[in-house]
Curated annotation (Swiss-Prot):
Binding site for Mg(2+): E257
Gene Ontology cellular-component annotations: cytoplasm
BP term (GO), one: phenylalanyl-tRNA aminoacylation
Enzyme class: ligase
Disulfide bonds, paired cysteine numbers: none
Domain of life of the native organism: Bacteria
Organism: Dinoroseobacter shibae (strain DSM 16493 / NCIMB 14021 / DFL 12)
Catalytic reaction annotation: tRNA(Phe) + L-phenylalanine + ATP = L-phenylalanyl-tRNA(Phe) + AMP + diphosphate + H(+)
Cofactors named for this entry: Mg(2+)
Protein name: Phenylalanine--tRNA ligase alpha subunit
Name of the gene this protein is made from: pheS
Length: 357
């Protein structure tokens, strides 16, 4: 046994790698190893011989296993030391630049619009995107025979058989939020209502989903003059120009009376829009004085209060300001497009510090 002990302890000490160590383990204490075979011979010995040989063989086996484990740990430590020597890292080097996300142009323009109107005392109001047809149409003085209520223009929610609740639609404009704001806060009130809206339309300048912002101001003795001033201030701030000329054209909207579409004087140079100069006119929004029936639907007495309202497409004014040619690209989720037209999340737009960077 002393010879076996010396033989294997010396071989274990000289093992150069884990493969050689495994070969020694199998040769010594494996199923057919020398020490294992010796232990099988215990059954052939007399009781007196077993009392002496048994403990000695067990002690030898334990010592060999301990030597194998210690050598394996030493080899692992040596391998780690060698790896650390060859694969060093300079911790003083700067880290890798992680690509930062950008704000979508719709989010940026929504923030710009909110900042401009907040400076004029307007709060932001929001409402549900699934609306009853009363809020979306009836409360806004849109009659039942109006083309906008047809299924070819409006997304109606499917109803289960026996469901007798009023019809619901994906809102076609953010005007229902104005009704809800009047019902909740009464008069006087100044709010803008940004958000997503839905219509059955799809081409280069129309998508089934798009974004609008509508404004509402109600007080005593409000007139079209107040509306004109608010819109001039907005256009001047949004397009970041010192001078702007607006043209009000008579129009018809069921929810305002009188109604007007608003154009801005502009020019196009190299495909870029220049506001406040040139001989062209570009329509940007609709507006007017709030119809008395709409005030009544909002719970406001039209004999005591007057107001104006306006609405514009956020996607459209984003395209005009930032030179985006196709409305459909807003919804394509193309990372290349988003990196090109996106904005830093750290640049919060304000009227005094600047809207865009």
């Amino acid at each position: 046994m002393d010879d076996l002990k010396s033989k294997y302890l010396a071989a274990i000490a000289e093992a150069a790698d884990e493969s050689a160590l495994e070969t020694l383990r199998v040769a010594a204490v494996g199923k057919k190893g020398e020490i294992s075979l010796k232990m099988r011979e215990l059954g052939k010995m007399t009781p007196e011989e077993r009392k002496t040989a048994g403990p000695a063989l067990n002690a030898l086996k334990d010592e060999i296993n301990s030597a194998l484990a210690a050598k394996k740990a030493a080899l692992a430590d040596a391998a780690l030391d060698e790896r650390l020597r060859s694969e060093w890292l300079d911790v003083t080097l700067p880290g890798r630049q992680r690509p930062a996300g950008t704000l979508h142009p719709i989010s940026q323009v929504s923030e710009e619009v909110a900042a401009i109107f907040a400076d004029m005392g307007f709060a932001v109001a929001e409402g549900p995107r699934v609306e009853s047809d009363w809020y979306n149409f009836d409360a806004l003085n849109i009659p039942g025979h109006h083309p906008a209520r047809a299924e070819m223009d409006t997304f109606y929610m499917k109803r289960a058989e026996g469901d007798d609740r009023p019809p619901h639609v994906l809102r076609t404009h953010t005007s229902p939020v104005q009704i809800r704001a009047m019902q909740e806060h009464g008069a006087p009130i100044r709010v803008i209502c940004p958000g997503g809206v839905y219509r059955c339309d799809y081409d280069q300048t129309h998508t089934p989903m798009f974004h609008q912002v509508e404004g509402l101001a109600i007080d005593r003795d409000i007139s079209m003059a107040n509306l004109k001033w608010v819109l001039e201030e907005f256009v001047r701030s949004y397009f970041e120009v010192d001078d702007v000329e607006l043209r009000f054209r008579a129009s018809h909207f069921p929810f305002t009376e009188p109604s007007a579409e608003v154009d801005i004087r502009c020019s196009w140079e190299g495909g870029q829009l220049k506001v406040g100069e040139g001989d062209d006119w570009l329509e940007i929004l609709g507006s007017g004085m709030v119809h008395p029936k709409v005030l009544e639907a909002g719970g406001i007495d039209p004999t005591q209060w007057q107001g104006f309202a306006f609405g514009m497409g956020i996607d459209r004014i984003a395209m005009l300001k930032y030179g985006i040619p196709d409305l459909r690209a807003f919804f394509d989720s193309d990372l290349r497009w988003l990196r090109n037209y996106g904005f830093s999340a750290l640049d919060v737009p304000t009227v005094h510090a600047g809207l865009s960077r």
